[in-house]
Amino acid sequence: NMDDNFIGCEKLFPFYQKISDVCSRIFGAKYTDPRPFTGMHCIDMITKTVCTPGSKMLILSKDHGGHASVKPVVERLGVKTMDAPYDIEENDLNYNAVNKIINEQAIDYILLAPSDLIKPLDVERIDTTNCVLLWDCSQVMGLIAAGLCPNPLKTMKNIIMFGGTHKTFPGPASGLIMTNDKYLHDMMETEINPKYLRHSQMHQKISLLFALIEFEKYGSGYMSHMVHCANYLGANLRDRGYDVADVHGQISATHQIFIRCSKEEMDTIYDNAYKCEVTLNKKHKQLFYGYGIRLGTQEIARYDWNDAALDTITEILVHLSNKDIDIDTVRRLIDSLPPKKIHYAFSEDVISRFNELYMN
């Protein structure tokens, strides 16, 4: 509808179409919307356009790894929330209990936005006959695109799959909404713009398009190495005395590693990490049996670091649990790591040719 758009906006449409074409190939998505800026912005846009005040929604609680912002955001819109039943031992929802609640209490939506997970949620077990699944796949988007994680878009109805494009998917900070249900697409398509978003920052979308095409070529190898890094590093840390979580013997099917520990050890590791400029997260939630540390391997995997480098990272992480840490020793270990050179990406030659096209 040109009445609701700016003069010249039609020049942008081919780029949106190209993004849609790539997402059709790697995600199997019929309808794609890259206008949101982040994964959290996707949640904001989707719930504002699809959900109605007074409706009922199941969410993944913060204690079970859910994104802490979901509950206040949707409740601010007048949506009534309740926590989805969860099985701590399985690191997944209790799907029998979830489906029972959906059917008995006439749940309208189930919004799952996991921040912490060492195995992808088995969302295909959710009965969406009479409800809509809003699946924030930010943490596993790259794994889905690489075919290393189930893709519910291909098997389920009444689902919107979305997420941030800068976690396991190695793109710019952006958001991506996908669905194969036309009625859901129609609810969002003409409401997001012009009501809730005016400027979609096209430089960001061009970067996303470039990253999608790059991932189509190199993403499978990258994701496989990322999962290898998580399991190799986790096994090393377990051998060195850390309590590393697993699910049925597998330390991770994602990029994350869970270390369970006391509050005192958690604080020691975190404080030392801050001093040594090591990036990790501390956690206080039931998913970690109280307290713990979360590690992510998506960045080191992009450098294509080998097992020898992972052995060095193990030594660094072991030092972090020492109250009397020798910071100079840790910094020497960090300095001994390989260069931070991006792999699983277009070559410099390809990028140079792209830049030449742009300049001309």
Where do the PLM segments sit?
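Conserved PLP-enzyme active-site core in the AAT-like
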Residues: 11-14, 18, 22-33, 37-243, ...
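N-terminal "arm"/small-domain region of PLP-dependent enzymes with the aminotransferase-like
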Residues: 1-6, 82
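Glycine-rich tight-turn/loop motif centered on a GG-T
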Residues: 5-9, 300-303
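A common structural junction motif
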Residues: 196, 276-280, 321
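Conserved small-domain helix->loop->beta segment predominantly found in fold-type I
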Residues: 212, 223, 227-270, 274-292
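Short acidic (Asp/Glu) and glycine-rich catalytic loops that position anionic groups and cofactors
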Residues: 1-2, 185-189, 207-214, 248-255, ...
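Short hydrophobic/aromatic beta-strand micro-patches
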Residues: 178, 258-262, 296-298
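PLP-dependent enzyme catalytic core of the Aspartate aminotransferase-like
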Residues: 289-360
